[in-house]
């Protein structure tokens, strides 16, 4: 027994009539312009078909003829076809211009809709993104304040002559304060010393401190 379940939507209707009338309705590629009044022909040919109603046929035809594929096919020099694919006269210029305008309008609507959808998507993504907490900038650690009270200078005294010996650890006045040093050579009043950084120099014995 043949399945008489009705078609669910216009897409299924278009697929069904393309299967029944393949020389007229095309599912892929550029469509052929349809004969004027083809709805009546369809309704008559499918009057006993319980799968599709006249209302469904009308809605399916409207969707088919408003598709970009169909509007692209409505161009100068093209011929309309009937259900069996037979030519039914060349397109009139008025119909070609109408199809061209409809195509441009349809594309403009799609472009505007896509633009609006993209804008909405950006706004939604922005709304979902957690707002950055306005934390104050991190303050860099300040160097320890220099004590107002300067440390008392270490009290030193001049060396006795018997303390000026090679290898003895002493302090030497370098102008900016005393620096530790070691005596490495003695030549009368001139004493060669080695600072803690390894630098050697000759100073007067009177500049050495204990």
UniProtKB/Swiss-Prot annotation:
Coiled-coil regions, chain positions: none
A single MF term (Gene Ontology): RNA strand-exchange activity
Keyword Cytoplasm part of the UniProt annotation: yes
Subcellular location field: Cytoplasm
Biased composition (Basic and acidic residues): 98-127
SMART domains listed in its UniProt record: ProQ (SM00945)
Record-level GO BP terms: post-transcriptional regulation of gene expression
One Pfam family of this chain: ProQ_C
Chief location category: cytoplasm
InterPro entries: ProQ (IPR023529), ProQ/FinO (IPR016103), ProQ/FinO_sf (IPR036442), ProQ_C (IPR035236)
TM ranges: none
Keywords: Chaperone, Cytoplasm, RNA-binding
GO cellular component, one term: cytosol
Xref: PANTHER family: RNA CHAPERONE PROQ
UniProt cross-references to HAMAP family, sorted A to Z: ProQ (MF_00749)
Function as written in the Swiss-Prot or TrEMBL entry: RNA chaperone with significant RNA binding, RNA strand exchange and RNA duplexing activities.
Family stated for the protein in its record: Belongs to the ProQ family.
Name of protein: RNA chaperone ProQ
């Amino acid at each position: 027994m043949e399945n008489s379940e009705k078609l669910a939507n216009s897409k299924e209707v278009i697929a069904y009539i393309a299967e029944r009338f393949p020389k007229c309705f095309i599912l892929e590629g550029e469509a052929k312009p349809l004969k004027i009044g083809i709805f009546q022909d369809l309704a008559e040919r499918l009057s006993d078909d319980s799968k599709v109603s006249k209302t469904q046929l009308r809605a399916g035809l409207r969707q088919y003829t408003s598709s970009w594929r169909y509007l692209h096919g409505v161009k100068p020099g093209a011929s309309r076809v009937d259900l069996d694919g037979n030519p039914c006269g060349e397109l009139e210029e008025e119909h070609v211009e109408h199809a061209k305008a409809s195509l441009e309008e349809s594309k403009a609507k799609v472009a505007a809709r896509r633009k609006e959808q993209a804008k909405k998507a950006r706004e939604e993504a922005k709304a979902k993104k957690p707002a950055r907490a306005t934390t104050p900038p991190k303050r860099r650690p300040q160097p320890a304040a220099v004590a107002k009270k300067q440390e008392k200078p270490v009290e030193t005294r001049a060396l006795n002559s018997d303390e000026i010996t090679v290898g003895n650890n002493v302090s030497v006045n370098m102008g900016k304060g005393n620096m530790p040093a070691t005596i490495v050579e003695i030549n009368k009043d001139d004493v060669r010393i080695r600072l803690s950084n390894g630098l050697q120099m000759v100073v007067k014995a009177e500049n050495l401190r204990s």
